[in-house]
């Protein structure tokens, strides 16, 4: 089970948002590269970056911070990034800079042709982030709920060659209310590609529950507010997950 620390970037700083609201942000660090190194040293085997300004602007914004993170840890562990990725040129620039995976969210739903092209051009590097509430997909930084069923869309994306799906339950994100295991497993069972859980990770109990369903196709979990608030000791949690995976 991959525990993937999230570094959310806003105006060059590491922040956490509550329920995806840019006006409800808490700053956790002024130096994103140092934060990346901290998590790598704590045993992270992948990092999850979000360009928050980029997600809302529809184009990359925190380039300097992303570059600094890749320079710091990019040679040691794979880094994945989402937020504001809307064209193939942006993907190419990021991959050339050392990014392992590019996460396409809103654009995958609104512009499926772009996702198809991205999978053709950069096979093995494309992850789709699906944000959902009650099984329906949301877009535009969660501000718009669509009529699309998560499972239907994910199956289509799988057929196009997407590497994996990050599934976020937006009713829970940033709330420390526990991962929606049931919905995550339901999605994973419907697919042959891995699913990464996200949204609401509260503590070690969630990690233990996720390890129980790892064989259903749940590959990892994004660790956000819980590792910054102190509700989850990241190094201890990854160690516990490894123990359970070996059991």
Curated annotation (Swiss-Prot):
Keywords tagged on the record: Amino-acid biosynthesis, Cytoplasm, Histidine biosynthesis, Isomerase
InterPro entries per UniProt: Aldolase_TIM (IPR013785), His_biosynth (IPR006062), HisA_bact_arch (IPR006063), Isoase_HisA-like (IPR044524), Isoase_HisA-like_bact (IPR023016), RibuloseP-bd_barrel (IPR011060)
GO molecular function list: 1-(5-phosphoribosyl)-5-[(5-phosphoribosylamino)methylideneamino]imidazole-4-carboxamide isomerase activity
Pathway(s) this gene product operates in, as recorded in its UniProt entry: Amino-acid biosynthesis; L-histidine biosynthesis; L-histidine from 5-phospho-alpha-D-ribose 1-diphosphate: step 4/9
Lineage top rank: taxon: Bacteria
Listed Pfam families: His_biosynth
Principal EC category: isomerase
Biological process per Gene Ontology, one example term: L-tryptophan biosynthetic process
GO cellular component terms listed in the entry, alphabetical order: cytoplasm
Record's subcellular location: Cytoplasm
Known EC number: 5.3.1.16
Reactions it catalyzes: 1-(5-phospho-beta-D-ribosyl)-5-[(5-phospho-beta-D-ribosylamino)methylideneamino]imidazole-4-carboxamide = 5-[(5-phospho-1-deoxy-D-ribulos-1-ylimino)methylamino]-1-(5-phospho-beta-D-ribosyl)imidazole-4-carboxamide
Predominant place of localization: cytoplasm
UniProt keyword Cytoplasm, yes or no: yes
Catalytic residue list: 8 (proton acceptor), 131 (proton donor)
Isomerase among keywords: yes
NCBIfam families: 1-(5-phosphoribosyl)-5-[(5-phosphoribosylamino)methylideneamino]imidazole-4-carboxamide isomerase, PRK13585.1
Family: Belongs to the HisA/HisF family.
Stated name of the protein: 1-(5-phosphoribosyl)-5-[(5-phosphoribosylamino)methylideneamino] imidazole-4-carboxamide isomerase
Lineage: Bacteria, Pseudomonadati, Pseudomonadota, Betaproteobacteria, Burkholderiales
Gene name per UniProt: hisA
